[in-house]
Amino acid sequence: MTVVPIRIVGDPVLHTATTPVTVAADGSLPADLAQLIATMYDTMDAANGVGLAANQIGCSLRLFVYDCAADRAMTARRRGVVINPVLETSEIPETMPDPDTDDEGCLSVPGESFPTGRAKWARVTGLDADGSPVSIEGTGLFARMLQHETGHLDGFLYLDRLIGRYARNAKRAVKSHGWGVPGLSWLPGEDPDPFGH
């Protein structure tokens, strides 16, 4: 099992769009990609996350892993990887997010969560670990995860989507933790679980 540090908000790799994974003419993926995917699963699992984008561990490639239920109250989970994802969503509400149902956290903003407006439905298409086409979709928490992880790969954190008092509270939290600068990370399994799982 290989668990690596997760970068914290302020690291340039989190704020830069990732590079698509190169697919050979025969459809094969780079040989070292399988090890990266295994490391991402190990790190996500150690952090008790529902998703992890490659740039969260310092790799600027366009892929994410996930292990997520459709709803916060459900125990049945879906697990997988999407390489070179393309996101499609229903309309994103223009109202203030609900603090009870729209709360969102991030392993790169450890221990904090803020209500974030997201589309109720999302679909991602891309490739699986074998290079075969894959399409996954969902509603609720699963749709939120798809939007969150794809956002990472586009160089955005969920903090960038916050509005009103939630945006102000997030800025204060980042400042109070001393984040927002390059070089900060935490190591799941070694550092305390910031979300108290």
Curated annotation (Swiss-Prot):
Kind of enzyme, top EC level?
hydrolase
Keyword Phosphoprotein attributed: no
- Coiled-coil residues: none
Residues the record lists as binding Fe cation: 106, 148, 152
Record bears the keyword Iron: yes
The record's listing under Pfam families reads: Pep_deformylase (PF01327)
Keywords on record = Hydrolase, Iron, Metal-binding, Protein biosynthesis
Residues in the active site? Answer: 149
Family label: Belongs to the polypeptide deformylase family.
Q: What is this protein's name?
A: Peptide deformylase
Q: What is the originating organism of this protein?
A: Mycobacterium bovis (strain ATCC BAA-935 / AF2122/97)
